[in-house]
Amino acid sequence: MFIIALTYTAPLEQVEQHLAAHRQFLDKHYQSGAFLFSGRKEPRTGGIIVAHAASSAEIERIIGEDPFHQAGIADYEITEFIPAKTAPDLAQYAEN
């Protein structure tokens, strides 16, 4: 399991220009099952994605598809973690 923290490196006006394409990127990876949660930070300095993938290399490949990454307007911090406890609806993601 991975937490991907995005931090904008460009003004919000520039981020807005790529937002529709970024949302399509998110939709693609929700459909594939890789993304579980996402949302913007408050204050609006970036966003958070909770993802499920086989490896950090897979997450890095996925990030490479993000229009924010391709435009060079966000930095990404990837944190891998092993879920030990979950809400009942998320039990499939816990490592036993």
Where in the sequence are the language-model features?
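Conserved, structured core segments of small domains
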Residues: 1-96
